[in-house]
Amino acid sequence: MNDSKLFFQFLFPQGYEVFLFDDVKNPPNLFVAHYYTDDEVERYFSAVDNYHSSYNRLHCIQLPVLFRILYCCGTRIGETLGIRKKDIDLESGIIRLTETKNGKERYVTMGGELLALARRFADRTFYQIADDEYVFRNKNGGGLKYDTIKHIHREILAMAGIPFVGNSHGPRIHDWRHTFAIRSFKHMSDNGTDMYVALPILSTYLGHGTIMATEHYLRLTLEMFPEIEEKMGKTAEKVFGGIMYEGN
């Protein structure tokens, strides 16, 4: 776009009729990412594990798994609700995500504690459902809907004593994905991984269409943990100058 504008600016004084447009900028992202602190994580999942619903008795055994997948695997809520029985390998802990934002399936891995919890969940529920049915279900046997989980999320925040600010400040369900990404960058940095090596790895794992969305998470990580930026030096300023990012 800039090269074209310069060319038109050159033509205009030569007598050519051209139209010069103002620079087009992407609209700002109005949502403010919330990073769940260690204390908030502990309180939130304590509330999840003690959540009961007379409306759907499955909630007490499926919500601890569902919300931990969001936090521990960094999945989007739509991808998580789209998990079917056949998508989970309870031996390896690998989950196949098929209902993704960009239509490309990918894989995430459950760690030891989450995998143990998922196995207990499977022991109690998988015998009731076919391979192609959703694992997170409503009381009628259909897949859970986003609006239901959104409502439960608000209830859990209240139980945990975590204020819901609203007005694009959350904390939202999607902020578990933000928290996963930031913690992943921090963990890799602490283990000596160069951030420019970590960037494409995490971008692929998160299923981003381009690396720009992942760069946004790296920017947030550097803001929260300045010591990482000090390791990176002045290169970070060159990389992040003027970057706009896509939905994540």
Protein language model features and the residues they cover:
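C-terminal secondary-structure termini that scaffold catalytic or DNA-interacting sites
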Residues: M232-N248
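Flexible interdomain linker/hinge and immediately adjacent N-terminus
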Residues: Y16-V48, T98, N138-N140
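Basic, Lys/Arg- and aromatic-enriched nucleic-acid-binding interface segment
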Residues: S46-I77
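Short, basic (Lys/Arg/His-rich) helix/loop patches that form interaction surfaces
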Residues: S53-R57, H151-P200, T204, H208
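Conserved tyrosine-mediated DNA breakage-rejoining catalytic core shared by Y-recombinases
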Residues: C73, G78, G82-A116
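Catalytic-site neighborhood detector that most strongly recognizes the C-terminal catalytic loop/helix
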Residues: Y35, E99, L206-K234
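Non-catalytic DNA-binding core/recognition domains of DNA-processing enzymes
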Residues: M1-P13, D22, M110
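C-terminal catalytic core of Y-nucleophile DNA break-rejoin enzymes
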Residues: N102-R119, D132-R154, G166-I173
